[in-house]
Amino acid sequence: RPTSMVFQGFALFPHMSVLENIGYGLKLKSIEKEVIFTKVTKMMDLVGLTGLSKRMPHELSGGQQQRVQLARALILENDVLLLDEPLSALDAQLRKDMCIELKRLQKTVGITFVHVTHNQEEAMSVADRIAIIADGEMLEEGTPEEIYSNPKNKFTAEFIGEKNIFNGTVVSFNTKNITIDIGNDTIEILNQGYKIKKNQKVSLSIKSESIEIIKNQNKSDDKLKVAQIMGTISEITFLGQFIRYLVLLKNGQEIQVRSPKEVKNIKLNDKVSLKWKLEDFLLHQK
């Protein structure tokens, strides 16, 4: 399929104006100057570069240079646009703005965008579907919600979001629950149709925001279908929208808990209970 590409670097011709950069591909196709000018003007309006046709690349901001590169690729009207980490050279806020812009552009032009990135937030915000690729192999694909909330693969669970990973051994199981030994402690999870056997080595994952910190409590709550283990607060960090707690478990593993608000009367070195719903844990056999 005819494909255009947007590179990691801006890759603009420094001796050409914005208009000349965007229209260069059409010029190579021997399109008439009047047609090129009309198409470039429309494309500049589409990507938010109106009035900048005579500017040189060094006179543009990083975001404007990236828009020029996008316009130069889109004006060829190919079936697919391949974007190779296109926002990596931009600062954090500009990346967020460009994610919104890319989403809008894709809906407007209606072609397939293949966006390559290592940035999770970038992928989640621009994609209709996400493919996780490692060592040349596609491990899984799905909607952003599916990939984040229900990863099928241990690598995906570690890579997407802030999840805690536990390695352990299946102690027992029935049609409802599974008990896994993680070393000096056991974790009970909901059996969601997993095909497992006793003494099997498995991995568990749980999102850091799915764990609740409770002080001075050490009992399971069967009525609410929750379970918990004990730990010690090793670090408390304020990160703006949430507070991150690091909790040291008896097996020596340190896990993250993200809370939208401060847990009252909790300080460093306090003994706490970590509480979760049984269904919040996912089991991975690879």
Show the residue positions of the predicted features.
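Residues that scaffold the ATP/ADP-binding catalytic core of kinase and kinase-like folds
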Residues: L90, D97, F159, I214, ...
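ABC ATPase nucleotide-binding domains
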Residues: P2-S4, Q8-F155
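C-terminal boundary and immediately downstream tail of ABC-type ATPase nucleotide-binding domains
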Residues: N150-T179, S205, K275
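Glycine-centered loop/turn positions within well-structured domains
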Residues: E121, E145, K154, F166, ...
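Non-catalytic connector elements of ABC transporters
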Residues: F173-K286
